[in-house]
Amino acid sequence: MIKLVCCGKMRMKWMKEGVQEYTSRIQPYDKIQIIEVQDEKAPENNSASDDEKVKQIEGQRMLAQIRQEEYVILLDLKGKTCDSVQLSKTIQDLYTYSHNKITFVIGGSLGVSQELIQRANMRWKISDNTFPHQLCRVIVLEQIYRAFRIM
């Protein structure tokens, strides 16, 4: 089973349609679940301390959606990059040898808490470019679909 745990709701119609499109393409290969946790509003003129509080709250909400037996792939700017073939091999190896529940985590706009980073089994940097977090959902789903097609 594939699960996406995401911070915040999808707001733009075309992105929602992209998520729906790739979700329906993935379903013949495996079950997929998308969980949206509420994002925390950052105060005006937020300090580094305020940012950490927001990341902590959002991190707790996301961690509450992750079970012990799940293999967690965290989207992280400090993660390692892997191309579509490498991602496909990673997913295939997980399914074959160890885990049948893979959870992709997409944090909020301020990043993720240290606890979430520590829980991650793998940290994945999808690109050197910066994307809106909502667009990352579409990109991740497309890459998961592509990974299944490559297998």
Where do the model's predicted regions map?
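Loop/turn-to-beta-strand initiation segments
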Residues: M1, N100-F104
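Short glycine-rich anion-binding loops that position phosphate/pyrophosphate groups of nucleotides
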Residues: M10, L77-K80, G108-G111
